[in-house]
Amino acid sequence: MDLHLSREQEMLRKMYRDFAENEVKPLAEWVDENEAFPEETVKKMAKLGMMGIYFPKEYGGAGADVLSYVMAVEEMSKVCGTTGVIISAHTSLCCAPIYENGTEEQKKYYLPKLCSGEWIGAFGLTEPGAGTDAQGQQTTAVLDEKGENWICLLYTSDAADDMQ
């Protein structure tokens, strides 16, 4: 087993590290103190392919490997935990389930928008009693009378205003 990084992985790690030091670290304290979402930083990460690192190019991803994704999360997390979690949740909790379990139609519809950063993935664990147990949630959705729209009773905040 070869435990060395490839030349491409070394270059990506340097790019991630430089980006983290130059773009993420200077804002990290402000992000934490203000409980802010670093929207401009996320846009820059998307332009560098960091919002879809290991997904195939045919779905808008960068076409790199999982180790490259892990290195990006690691480098961002070294300087700003929030930014590391943004990449991690977006990729692992939103994009990956679509890529691994979605239909071809779903992959072609959702992944390009997610990998480009046009949409940012999220994952909610908000039910009383569910805590961090995603399987413990009880929320259900039912089709409306016309069979066209799903109805789900939930509480939302301004954070969901831009969600599709």
Placement of each model-derived feature along the sequence:
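N-terminal glycine-rich flavin-associated loop
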Residues: 85-105, 131-134
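Conserved small/polar residues in nucleotide/adenosyl-binding loops
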Residues: 155-160
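Hydrophobic, small-residue-rich alpha-helical packing segments that form membrane-like cores
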Residues: 133, 149-150
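Short strand-connecting beta-turns/loops that link adjacent beta-strands
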Residues: 145-147
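Amphipathic, small/basic residue-rich leader segments at the start of a protein or domain
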Residues: 1-88, 105-116, 120
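A structural signal for short hydrophobic beta-strand segments in well-ordered beta-sheet cores
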Residues: 139-142
